[in-house]
Amino acid sequence: MRPPEFWNKPPSHFDLRACLLSPLGALYAKGTATRLRKGAPTRAPVPVICVGNLNAGGTGKTPTVIWLMEQLGAAGHEVHVVSRGYGGRLEGPVQVDPRRHSAADVGDEPLLMAAFGEVWVARDRGAGVTEAAAAGASVIVMDDGFQNPSVAKDFSIIVVDAKRGFGNGRCLPAGPLREPVATGLSRADLVLSLGDARAQETFQSIWGAEIPVPHLTGHVEPLPTGMPWQGTKVLAFAGIGHPEKFFATLRGLGAELCRAEALEDHQTLAPALLTRLEQEARLLGAQLVTTEKDAVRLPLSFRPKVITLPVRLRVAQGDTLLARLKDIAPPPD
């Protein structure tokens, strides 16, 4: 289900629906605060870096986790990721093995991240962190879980889509937030806003004064694959948080977007859907294209029919973040 448009209006914009839902938003915020106060968090014997957000839905956490896996791995770390495994049936803790696990088992994001290193799926994040440390992790990256109190975090990065920012600044269901901005950022160590220069300027003008921690910027860009996108007719489909960003990327590469099929985030790619997409692409004379996250949900027999467009995070002040990471998780001897 797509979020209502009034969620992403700036806080200065009056909307009656948001106002009427605000009491429920206050209850949601209270519930989050109560949950965060409960229980004793598991303290891992190695540093834990949390990649989270304040918004419900996609903000760019997965590319950020992959970036951290690559950078920490290059520094000599044995990096393990712990994820809840949204959309998967296994409760865990279980180490993701792409050779025997499917997206239906562990979720699409953990399966994608497992191509870059060691990934654990665990509904009980504390148990997942314990297993990862026992398996030899020298640093653990927690995928999401900023509002989960079961694991002590050494460094928390809040990822935010610069174009949408923190929306109207209200909590669910009056707005997109899991908790109030001030409350969430008081526990954060860094904010990473993702988007182009124009989006970053807008984000800074609306939210810059509200950010009490270091604020870095970045953007996600397509990897060069040798594919001649210019003028190529494509039928694109995407089941991610904001599929329109994927479609815009294809247009920016010069592809002729004959059809754009926006699916629900993590949507099951049923045989009937894939058959329809294949038939439409054939009628249009177009190539099927999808995201990396959607590709791992495709049946193996269908994957040769689809081109995947990989993207990677670029952090504008990457050296600043790398220096901070070195302090938190010194490279192994």
UniProtKB/Swiss-Prot annotation:
Family listed: Belongs to the LpxK family.
InterPro entries per UniProt: LpxK, P-loop_NTPase
Pfam family, one: LpxK
The keyword ATP-binding belongs to this UniProt entry's keyword annotation: yes
EC number: 2.7.1.130
Keywords annotated in UniProt: ATP-binding, Kinase, Lipid A biosynthesis, Lipid biosynthesis, Lipid metabolism, Nucleotide-binding, Transferase
Organism: Ruegeria sp. (strain TM1040)
Protein name: Tetraacyldisaccharide 4'-kinase
Cellular component, GO annotation: plasma membrane
GO-annotated biological processes: lipid A biosynthetic process; lipopolysaccharide core region biosynthetic process
